[in-house]
Amino acid sequence: MLSRLLPFLVTISSLSLEFIAYGTELPSPSYVWFEARFFQHILHWKPIPNQSESTYYEVALKQYGNSTWNDIHICRKAQALSCDLTTFTLDLYHRSYGYRARVRAVDNSQYSNWTTTETRFTVDEVILTVDSVTLKAMDGIIYGTIHPPRPTITPAGDEYEQVFKDLRVYKISIRKFSELKNATKRVKQETFTLTVPIGVRKFCVKVLPRLESRINKAEWSEEQCLLITTEQYFTVTNLSILVISMLLFCGILVCLVLQWYIRHPGKLPTVLVFKKPHDFFPANPLCPETPDAIHIVDLEVFPKVSLELRDSVLHGSTDSGFGSGKPSLQTEESQFLLPGSHPQIQGTLGKEESPGLQATCGDNTDSGICLQEPGLHSSMGPAWKQQLGYTHQDQDDSDVNLVQNSPGQPKYTQDASALGHVCLLEPKAPEEKDQVMVTFQGYQKQTRWKAEAAGPAECLDEEIPLTDAFDPELGVHLQDDLAWPPPALAAGYLKQESQGMASAPPGTPSRQWNQLTEEWSLLGVVSCEDLSIESWRFAHKLDPLDCGAAPGGLLDSLGSNLVTLPLISSLQVEE
């Protein structure tokens, strides 16, 4: 019976030794997994604790759905913790089943238990990556190119674009070199363009690949930085914009220059240009200029000269406003002259004309009025008297000064404010034709009558032109027996106004001048036949005129509506 138990004991002992040799003397790896990228399939495991220098690991691989494990002998390296299984899994991207793998530790004759991957290794386990990114700046735009992974072990037709044909997406991140904040952009192809940010000279770009139809993990590519230099700003676009701007500026400048040239007067032809003569001073100039002599008036000699000028022929009423005591005969033509067509008037003038009644002009001023005194012609008819019984001596109201009559003679003075520049003469010879009344404005030259050379009749014939006429509405009548003397004129100028009136000397004391209540027109034309001696009279007396008449009424007054001259009261006369 003992012989029967011996073979059984030997078999049990051998089994126990074999169990000890391949048993759990070594711990197994705790975790095994695949870490794969495109055509880079790496199997990783964790090492066992307290491993020695002689410890190594064995790896077995099988396809999913197959029971046979294939040992991978290239992975038996000392202390290695990973093994590249790419060559054993090249068909991974064409088969959907995947692979499984297991790992154990070996130390001399001791072995550990197998540790298998927890999940099946498929395409979804592949991590998506980008091999590199290329950036190029041109015309102010950044052109980027994404390079997918191109492993050398990749079989023909299994490129990244062929394996992942659809739904490829790339996420692009752009940031300044000195900042952490970035901007992202998504593209669906391996090329992209970026605009250079304003004020950015250096920036960095990185790309993250994605597949919209899978859940693969992805890794950012290596960041690529680009430094934009000054030369890169001079691109074709920038140069084109610069050239166009310069052309526009030059065009505007040319237009402005042309406009200025057109408005600017051109150069005259040489034939029309007269050169300025050179200044030369001849020894004997043809027309030497004589400077105006200015003489200082000697105040001591001046009174003597004034006395001499009083007795000279030049004494008279002039524009200077200075007068003398010597009587001056006024020979200036009257502003308003009666037409001499009436024969009775002419006859009366011829008979009554004598040097008895002549006036003296003393202290006459710019008003040009010469008032006469009958002292020089006493043989004439009735004397002129003041109407109100008083005389104006050296009147300054209108710069008209009157000289008193000689004692025993009637006085006649006229106020320049009332009479102005008006002198009225009687008509002349009947053979003269009717003349139209003419109105003068300004100054008329006055000439002096010389009583010694000619008689009063000759002076009237030569010096009194009949140029003016009365208005027909005036109704002035002169009686036939009226004989009134001609006014004495003084040398000088008589101021004329645009509108003025003339007064005629009176005749006999019983005859008077009458004036109608209506205003008589100075511009009217009257015929000499309508005038008669009986019509030369005035009807109304006007006190403000301050004009005197002899008793009996040679001249009562003039109308209040007569146009008077402006008062000139700025000059003063010594006498």
Swiss-Prot record:
Signal peptide bounds: 1-16
- Provide the residues annotated with a glycan attachment (glycosylation): 50, 66, 113, 182, 238
Pfam families assigned to the protein according to its UniProt record, in alphabetical order: Tissue_fac
The keyword Electron transport appears for this protein: no
The record's Gene Ontology biological-process terms are: interleukin-10-mediated signaling pathway; intestinal epithelial structure maintenance; negative regulation of autophagy; negative regulation of inflammatory response; positive regulation of receptor signaling pathway via JAK-STAT; ubiquitin-dependent endocytosis
Cysteine disulfide partners in this protein: 204-225
Q: What is its main location?
A: membrane
Gene Ontology molecular functions: interleukin-10 receptor activity
What are the Phosphotyrosine sites (modified residues) in this protein? Answer: 443, 493
> What topology does the record note for this protein and the membrane?
Single-pass type I membrane protein
Record GO cellular component, one term: cilium
Subcellular localization, as worded in the UniProt entry: Cell membrane; Cytoplasm
Q: Does the keyword Lipid biosynthesis apply?
A: no
What Gene3D superfamilies does its record include?
Immunoglobulins
InterPro entries named among the record's database cross-references: FN3_dom, FN3_sf, Ig-like_fold, Type-II_Cytokine-TF_Rcpt
Per the record, ranges on the Cytoplasmic side are 263-575
PTM comment: the record says: Phosphorylated. Phosphorylation of the cytoplasmic tail induced STAT3 activation.
Q: Which of UniProt's keywords are assigned here? A: Cell membrane, Cytoplasm, Disulfide bond, Glycoprotein, Membrane, Phosphoprotein, Receptor, Signal, Transmembrane, Transmembrane helix, Ubl conjugation
Q: Which residues lie on this side of the membrane: Extracellular?
A: 17-241
Q: Where are the transmembrane segments?
A: 242-262
Give the highest taxon in the source lineage.
Eukaryota
- How is the quaternary structure described? Interacts with IL10. Interacts with IL10RB. Interacts (via its cytoplasmic domain) with JAK1 (via N-terminus). Interacts with BTRC; this interaction leads to IL10RA ubiquitination and subsequent degradation. Interacts with STAT3.
Q: State the family it belongs to.
A: Belongs to the type II cytokine receptor family.
Q: What does this protein do?
A: Cell surface receptor for the cytokine IL10 that participates in IL10-mediated anti-inflammatory functions, limiting excessive tissue disruption caused by inflammation. Upon binding to IL10, induces a conformational change in IL10RB, allowing IL10RB to bind IL10 as well. In turn, the heterotetrameric assembly complex, composed of two subunits of IL10RA and IL10RB, activates the kinases JAK1 and TYK2 that are constitutively associated with IL10RA and IL10RB respectively.
Protein's recorded name: Interleukin-10 receptor subunit alpha
